[in-house]
Design a protein with these regions (language model features):
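N-terminal juxtamembrane cytosolic/stromal segments of multi-pass membrane proteins
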Residues: 1-49, 53
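Membrane-interface helix-boundary motifs at transmembrane edges
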Residues: 22-32, 92-100, 154-159
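Alpha-helical transmembrane segments of integral membrane proteins
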Residues: 33, 37, 103-107, 132-142
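Transmembrane helix-loop junctions in multipass membrane proteins, especially transporters and channels
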Residues: 28, 50-62, 90-94, 124-129, ...
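Alpha-helical transmembrane segments with an aromatic anchor "belt"
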Residues: 58-123
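Terminal transmembrane helical module of multi-pass membrane proteins
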Residues: 124-159
Length: 159
């Protein structure tokens, strides 16, 4: 078992998901402040992706920007996931609390957020023929976050 700062626990969970989420559970660590900050960064990443993606790769360019759909797609969907996961875990004898599900789920989104920012930067540098790199980075972030989410839910509910 390790002694980490709250940010250290986040890095430990992202880079060592099997061990990290189990250690997080047994040490009763995890910061609600950091998880809310991650959800805020998720919203910011979606806004940046929508507005700042290079014009060659941006299919959603509009003159009027509406933030409400992005709030729904990031913050509302996240809390719907947390609440739904908690409701199902109570029916299936999971051990996760609402707070732990929120923390673990937010920690799992970090690779997606980071890869979204990297893809936006690359979209402003690369040409259309090199779009495979942007797609690969996006799929890497999604896949890594899905793996982390599965491991996190397995650890938090003890399935």
């Amino acid at each position: 078992m390790y002694e980490f700062t709250p940010v250290g626990w986040l890095k430990h969970c992202v880079f060592h998901p099997v061990e990290g989420f189990e250690d997080l559970r047994w040490k009763k660590q995890g910061s609600m402040k950091i998880s809310m900050l991650i959800v805020l960064f998720l919203f910011i990443a979606m806004v940046v992706d929508r507005q700042l993606t290079g014009f060659q790769f941006n299919d959603s360019y509009v003159k009027v920007f509406n933030v409400v759909p992005l709030i729904v797609q990031s913050v509302v969907y996240f809390f719907t996931w947390v609440l739904g996961n908690w409701a199902i875990c109570t029916l299936l004898d999971g051990e996760g609390t609402l707070k732990k599900i929120c923390i673990y789920s937010a920690y799992s989104l970090v690779p997606y957020i980071v890869c979204t920012f990297i893809a936006v930067i690359f979209s402003n540098v690369l040409v259309q023929d090199e779009s495979i790199w942007i797609t690969a980075i996006q799929y890497l972030g999604i896949g890594w976050s899905v793996i982390l989410m599965v491991r996190a839910m397995r650890a938090v509910h003890q399935y």
